């Protein structure tokens, strides 16, 4: 399974998850094996404008990061908060959006494997 998690750092499985997808400096793409163990972790730039856009240029840049994420082909995105535009874009691409318990990538993967997930709803500020 390919699981995307927004993070505050690039410290492998011990990377701390970012509380908000749109403000995360990094995105960790975690590949798990059939038993749910972490097989690999790859990090990508996650900085993108927040979903509350002031101009068409900002909206275009947001679509760009959404396209980059979609191109990574994650099966699931695990986040605590995500704006309505991102929820709409990723859901339309068939990506499952959930929140899970845990502070680090490894803790979140354990929660996903244990089924301790909930459907992610759009965050509105």
Describe each region flagged by the PLM.
Residues 60-98:
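Mid-chain, well-packed structural core segment of small domains
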Residues 1-60, 64, 71, 97-125:
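Non-catalytic interface/targeting segments
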């Amino acid at each position: 399974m390919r699981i995307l998690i927004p993070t505050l750092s690039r410290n492998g499985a011990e990377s701390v998850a970012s509380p908000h997808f749109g403000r995360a400096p990094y995105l960790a793409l975690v590949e798990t094996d059939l038993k749910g163990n972490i097989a690999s972790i790859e990090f990508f730039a996650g900085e993108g404008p927040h979903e509350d856009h002031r101009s068409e240029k900002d909206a275009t840049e947001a679509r760009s990061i959404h396209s980059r994420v979609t191109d990574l082909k994650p099966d699931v995105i695990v986040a605590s908060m995500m704006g309505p535009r991102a929820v709409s874009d990723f859901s339309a691409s068939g990506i499952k959006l959930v929140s899970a318990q845990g502070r680090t990538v490894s803790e979140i993967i354990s929660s996903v494997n244990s089924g301790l997930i909930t459907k992610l709803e759009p965050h509105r500020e």
